[in-house]
Structures are given as C-alpha cells and as structure tokens.
Amino acid sequence: MKFTNLTAKEFGAFTDSMPYSHFTQTVGHYELKLAEGYETHLVGIKNNNNEVIAACLLTAVPVMKVFKYFYSNRGPVIDYENQELVHFFFNELSKYVKKHRCLYLHIDPYLPYQYLNHDGEITGNASNDWFFDKMSNLGFEHTGFHKGFDPVLQIRYHSVLDLKDKTADDIIKNMDGLRKRNTKKVKKNGVKVRYLSEEELPIFRSFMEDTSESKAFADRDDKFYYNRLKYYKDRVLVPLAYINFDEYIKELNEERDILNKDLNKALKDIEKRPENKKAHNKRDNLQQQLDANEQKIEEGKRLQEEHGNELPISAGFFFINPFEVVYYAGGTSNAFRHFAGSYAVQWEMINYALNHGIDRYNFYGVSGKFTEDAEDTGVVKFKKGYNAEIIEYVGDFIKPINKPVYAAYTALKKVKDRIF
C-alpha cells in the first residue's frame, strides 16, 4: 500500500463506488473549492495493483500567517471495516499534512455511531466504538457528542429513509396518516413538478426567504446555491412544485360531477326510506365535500386570473450521488402552503431515487435534541412521518500537528473569545 496524491478522475471514480460517500467528497465539490480559491488536496491510498482503496478531499486555510488548518469535510471515503487500512491512512495523512506546514488537522467522518428513532430512543449500535480508541491512539482528540446546529461543525444527526428493495407503494404504506393524505392529495390535485435551471434559481430563493422568515432560521446566501448548482452540475437538482390550473380545475369539475351523482343517489335513498340515518349522514357528508369542492374551484379560477395558468408553490435543493439523494434545503410559499407543494417535491425526489437505483433518501440534518421545545421539532415530526430513521455520526476529531504552536494558538483563541 502507498499513500499518494490522486487525480480528480481517480478520486471521483472511487468515491462514486463507495457507500457513505458524502457530497462534499466528490469531484464537484473539489472543483467548487478550487474556484473559490482554496488550497485543495486530493489524497488516498493505492494497493499493490495501483487501485485506489481510500480517498480524501482536503482543504487548507492559512492560520497564524505561516501555518495551515487542514479540514476534510466528511472524509475520508474508506472501508471503515478494515481497521488496518484506517490506521495506515490516518497515520500517513498526518505525515502528509505535516509536510505542508499544517498546524492542526480536523476531520468529521461520514461514519455512523448509533441509530435512533425520531423520539430519540436508541434502536441500534453501528459497531464503530473502536474508532474512538483508534483515533485517540493516533493522536486525535474527539470534540464531544454535540447536539444542535452549529455554524462551523457539521450536523451529527441525519434523518434517513431506507429505499433498498422497496417500491413506491411500500414507501406510501409505511408513511403516517398525514404524509399519506398529503402525498395522495398532491398526486390528485394537479400539482406538478419540474426542475429549475440556473436562471430560474430566484424562484427557489424566494421560497427560502419565505420559510426562513416564518420559521426564524438562518439560510445560506445566494452564492452558496448558485456555486453548487454551477460546479456540481447534474449532481444538484432543484425541483419546483407548481399548480397547473387547467388540469387542477378540470379534475375538480370531474370530482364535482361524481359528488353530485352520489348526492342525488343519497337523496333518492332518503325519499324511499326517510328513517334511514345512514343515508342522511351520507347526504350531509357529500354536501360538505361539494361545498369544499366549489370553494376550491372558485379559488382556482381566481388564482388563475391573478397568476396565469402555472403557479409555483414550493421548491427544494438536492444533492445527488450514487450512494444517496440528499434533501439539503427547501421552501414553500406561505400564501399557498395549503396546496402541500413540499409533499410533491419529496415524492418526486423519492421516486427519482427509486428510479435511479439509489437506496438511500437523506432528509438530512436534525438537532438531535428530540424535545417539544427543540428548534426543529416540527421538522423532526415531518421526517418521522415518512418512517425514516435517525443516524448519529461519530462527530469531529482534531489532531494537533505542531503541538507547541497549537497550544499557543488555542490559548490565544480562548483569550479572544473571552474579550469579544
């Protein structure tokens, strides 16, 4: 085995072939970081047949003028079951970054620690406890099992839906009642989905602004999304849910005809048997449905006059690789939330994964707090409704490479933090 630099082609071919390969360990992310002006390294291990068996994208940032901070975002991509390989990689990586004036090395591997349900109850262990001892022996310090959303650290909890050996019908069957109803609702009510181009990205951004204002969370800036759409190319998809009013109103008219037919039948049943309570209840229920149907038709015609035949209602931002589809961000028009456009977006992308043989649909980050007063309690309930599971990752590890200078650096940082 040998530790070596990799070409982008070698790196991409390997990371695309591996499980637990995060979108930040892809050629698209490498090209993005180069364009942003970061010092970037592609490194890995090759076996005696010159085949890549481990790979890692590293970025380096200047620290204290003469040193650098090296970071591998969700790297390396490696067979973590091969502990000998893991040891060799991190040992050689430390030597490599030392040659490049590294002050300290930071990693947050895409490696599960344990599994939980959406109530926060542990359902299983990922059998990676050994990794903590291994990293400690190699000189890495674990930063702790942090929870919540941090502007610097990667989120440690993901909500993930397993699609392996499942059909679309299986997914719907396993949803809770609300998710089933809304998924069927958008399939029925003329809600369509198409993918936005780079020129149309402002539509998505407007929805994100609506959502961030209503839910009081900090969104990324425009540059973040535009750059990833540009450099990730077909590894980013931005689905837009919209109402096609011609189809929507047509379907509502067809529904009205059926309801009127059923109502007339119920009225005839009452004429024949006035004492039949079931017929009276059925009449009342059908009349309520008809009233609601009429309101929807009136609303649809009004909105069609105001907005034209197509009305954008929701959009999402997704990262794609052979391992998983990642729901990174999404927003919905507050004025048209009742059309349940976000469910159309989710259903479109779940089916995208199924149709492309991708076994994992990642709803992405949750805080890991699982309490009613947690900042993301509504989001957790939404993801829980799809019958997803929670994966908790091992977290962050830091290795001081130049120990004396790193000690001085951390001491100065603590003083600065106290002052400011």
Curated annotation (Swiss-Prot):
SUPFAM superfamilies: Acyl-CoA N-acyltransferases (Nat), tRNA-binding arm. Its main location: cytoplasm. It catalyses: beta-D-GlcNAc-(1->4)-Mur2Ac(oyl-L-Ala-D-isoglutaminyl-L-Lys-(N(6)-Gly)-D-Ala-D-Ala)-di-trans,octa-cis-undecaprenyl diphosphate + 2 glycyl-tRNA(Gly) = MurNAc-L-Ala-D-isoglutaminyl-L-Lys-(N(6)-tri-Gly)-D-Ala-D-Ala-diphospho-di-trans,octa-cis-undecaprenyl-GlcNAc + 2 tRNA(Gly) + 2 H(+). It comes from the Bacteria. Pfam families: FemAB. Its EC number is 2.3.2.17. InterPro entries: Acyl_CoA_acyltransferase, FEMABX, PG_Glycine_Bridge_Synth, tRNA-bd_arm. GO terms for biological process: cell wall organization; peptidoglycan biosynthetic process; regulation of cell shape. One of its GO terms (cellular component) is cytoplasm. It is found in: Cytoplasm. GO terms for molecular function: aminoacyltransferase activity; nucleotide binding. Keywords: Acyltransferase, Cell shape, Cell wall biogenesis/degradation, Cytoplasm, Peptidoglycan synthesis, Transferase. Homodimer. Interacts with FemB. Catalyzes the formation of the pentaglycine interpeptide bridge, which is characteristic of the S.aureus peptidoglycan. Adds glycines 2 and 3 of the pentaglycine bridge, using glycyl-tRNA(Gly) as donor. Belongs to the FemABX family. PANTHER family: AMINOACYLTRANSFERASE FEMA (PTHR36174:SF2), LIPID II:GLYCINE GLYCYLTRANSFERASE (PTHR36174). This is Aminoacyltransferase FemA. The gene is femA.
